[in-house]
Amino acid sequence: MPITTSAQPRKQRLALFNAPLHLRHKLFNAKLSPELEKKLGVKRLPVRRGDTVMILRGDFKGVTGKVVRVDLKKVRIYVEGATRTNSRGQTVYYPIHPSKVMIVDVDMSDKARQKIIERRKK
């Protein structure tokens, strides 16, 4: 289901900015590693807390770690190993867009997620 039917970039951006949380979850798709893709028969899955991902772009390129937190409002994920030090000297997780990561290992503890994979299979 498309969020908007307009072709104007400003309206596309506005629709993404104002999208409700249940539709924002669709923006969290990340590609799977080639091994997982063959195993599950799916190319992309939404990133969830507990998944192991590899960062493909940015300063933390090549870092592999578990997803610690998922922020639906900001459309960002937080990964172990992708940290920086803030002005107070505390270590904080660096926000990363889900499209810039590749899922290396999937947390299959949720039965609903298994149903999603079965539904999406090629």
Swiss-Prot record:
Protein's name according to its UniProt entry: Large ribosomal subunit protein uL24
Swiss-Prot/TrEMBL keywords: Ribonucleoprotein, Ribosomal protein, RNA-binding, rRNA-binding
Pfam families found in the cross-reference section: KOW (PF00467), Ribosomal_L26 (PF16906)
Key word Phosphoprotein present: no
Function: One of two assembly initiator proteins, it binds directly to the 5'-end of the 23S rRNA, where it nucleates assembly of the 50S subunit.
SUPFAM superfamilies cross-referenced by the UniProt entry: Translation proteins SH3-like domain (SSF50104)
Quaternary assembly: Part of the 50S ribosomal subunit.
Any one GO biological process: translation
The keyword Iron is assigned to this record: no
Disulfide bonds, paired cysteine numbers: none
InterPro entries on file: KOW, Rib_uL2_dom2, Ribosomal_uL24_CS, Ribosomal_uL24_euk/arc, Ribosomal_uL24_KOW, Translation_prot_SH3-like_sf
NCBIfam families attached to this UniProt entry: rplX_A_E
Family matches, as CDD domains: KOW_RPL26
GO cellular component: large ribosomal subunit
Stated family: Belongs to the universal ribosomal protein uL24 family.
Lineage, broadest ranks: Archaea, Thermoproteota, Thermoprotei, Thermoproteales, Thermoproteaceae
